[in-house]
Amino acid sequence: LENIQVMVLLVATIFFLVRSFALYKKDGFILLAYGLFVSTFPFIGAGRELSFGATLGISAQSVLGIKILMGCIVVLLVAAALFVFLRFVAPKTTAIFRYLSHPTSLHIYLAILVFGASSAFEQGSFQMPKSVILEEILELIAFTILLRAAWVLK
């Protein structure tokens, strides 16, 4: 299931980026800044889920290089989002409230809740039985909700 999770997260990242740039052509900078920022969520998730060495069969030093590269990409996306937001989005308070109540944000909130439930099964919290399969299934559902969040970005 973890390889499927990684694929869903990478597709969500690509969807966020493609839709963000398509929306820029239509609506300008407000959704471009938002899309660049939220595209980091599934990308970070993919990095978290990917068992680099086991999946790719590479050395620990190469794994470190990939993690550093992924970190640089995240920093670049966040910096670009911040630059676009600070330079081109006005009024900022209105934009922030729009971001917080945007349908994409609502999907992200739901994904976070489902991901939290998966952690309860992983750790056996709240008197829940430990279950790796339920944890993985709930994570896949959460990541699919992130993919849907990218789809509703408009």
Language-model segments: what does each one mean?
Residues 88-112, 134:
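Membrane-helix boundary/juxtamembrane motif in polytopic membrane proteins
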Residues 1-3, 57-69, 127-138:
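Non-cytosolic membrane-interface motifs at loop->transmembrane helix junctions
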Residues 27-40, 100-111:
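Membrane-interfacial loop-to-transmembrane alpha-helix junctions, especially the N-terminal start
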Residues 21, 50-59, 88-90, 119-129:
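Juxtamembrane "helix-exit" motif on the non-cytosolic side of transmembrane helices
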Residues 113-125, 131-154:
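C-terminal transmembrane-bundle signature of multipass membrane proteins
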Residues 19-26, 85-97:
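Cytoplasmic membrane-interface regions of multi-pass membrane proteins
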Residues 5-18, 71-87, 139-154:
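Hydrophobic cores of alpha-helical transmembrane segments in multi-pass inner/ER membrane proteins
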Residues 35, 41-59, 74-86:
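C-terminal halves and exits of single transmembrane alpha-helices
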